[in-house]
Amino acid sequence: MSQTRYFFTSESVSEGHPDKVADQISDAVLDDFLRQDSSSRVACETFVTTGQVIVGGEVTTKGIVDIQTIARKVVTEIGYTKSEYMFEANSCGVLSALHSQSPDINRGVDRKEEIADEFDRVGAGDQGMMFGYACTETPVLMPAAIQFAQHLMKKLAEIRKEGKIMTYLRPDAKSQVTLEYENEVVKRVDAVVVSTQHDPEPEGVSEAAWQEVIKNDIIENVIKVVIPADLIDENTKFHINPTGRFVIGGPHGDTGLTGRKIIVDTYGGAAPHGGGAFSGKDPSKVDRSAAYAARHVAKNIVAAGLADKCTVQVSYAIGVARPVSIYINTHDTAKHGLNDAQIQEKAELIFDLRPAAIIKRFSLNKPEGWCYQQTAAYGHFGRDIFPWEKTEKVGELKSALNLA
């Protein structure tokens, strides 16, 4: 095999990033609707800016949700609790513009009872294609760059909320990790970027000196804690708040909208994306549920040792339960003499990708031990609390391919 060397980069953002504030509010609203009425149809979008939250969208439900209370609770949990942030939980305006879902859409999703198979009664909420991916780069079968980027943001938030060190931290932050690969294997971390919102420099301390304190703290307490030491060398570059001062941030610094961080939510650019966002959508929307199912298929294929990498694409027509197409690609990493067609044939028999089957398999309309708000920061994949991360189909796949 010829030597192949390349660099690959993924980014993440904190729970206090404006777009993620919006995602979390949308999913918290969804959670409350589903708690009251598990058959709720929800498409909830949130807009956040200086001192203002606007929640809009379409809903069909028997539930009654207090948008004001939910939005303020989410903003409080994130940490926007000081007036100097210019976006504060108790004082920001909250406007609700939710209204009824179009009956034209609903008639295609909820089919007639006389259809014999219960899983054929629920059509896809829209057309589109969704992707799932898994690889052997990390124990959770996720690409390494996005995992490191997510964990940097989680660690930074953990430190901020504990309040024991780095007490100058504010909620908004971003990370980016560049890895060097050789023969498809991660060899080292080439660069790490962390930009974090912070308090102004203390009186008598220069901006340059303050930024040096922040840089050293981030490197020692965040980067070196998250990233394995054997991947960092003397040539690894650390870019900490590279533009300097980052005091103004959050929704006051940038407007936030639901659904603008779809690559952060998934695989960090290591796999294709169908374009549909997740947050604020109930599981009848295949943008969300089918993407979770596609990840489940890909992860089980890799966990079964059938391949080192796997991409799954599934597509739907609105109102039609069965997928229009299914495509599986193992990127020339299939094992045991298998090819993609053989793997796909068995996968299609084992994994039912009709929306109602997906919803039932993962209890997506009645989450147990998790909630949608949890998915809205730090990634929807690679986290064991979510049911689509289970690898319970490994034995069935192996048996079907005579590998058990």
From Swiss-Prot:
SUPFAM superfamilies: S-adenosylmethionine synthetase
Known catalytic reactions: L-methionine + ATP + H2O = S-adenosyl-L-methionine + phosphate + diphosphate
Keywords on record: ATP-binding, Cytoplasm, Magnesium, Metal-binding, Nucleotide-binding, One-carbon metabolism, Potassium, Transferase
Residues binding ATP: 17, 172-174, 245-246, 254, 260-261, 277, 281
EC number: 2.5.1.6
Cofactors: Mg(2+); K(+)
Gene3D superfamilies recorded: 3.30.300.10
Compartment(s) where it occurs, according to its Swiss-Prot or TrEMBL record: Cytoplasm
An MF annotation (GO) of this entry: magnesium ion binding
Location of the region described as Flexible loop in the Swiss-Prot/TrEMBL record: 101-111
InterPro entries: ADOMET_SYNTHASE_CS (IPR022631), S-AdoMet_synt_C (IPR022630), S-AdoMet_synt_central (IPR022629), S-AdoMet_synt_N (IPR022628), S-AdoMet_synthetase (IPR002133), S-AdoMet_synthetase_sfam (IPR022636)
Assembly: Homotetramer; dimer of dimers.
Similarity comment text for this entry: Belongs to the AdoMet synthase family.
Designated name of the protein: S-adenosylmethionine synthase
Organism: Pelodictyon phaeoclathratiforme (strain DSM 5477 / BU-1)
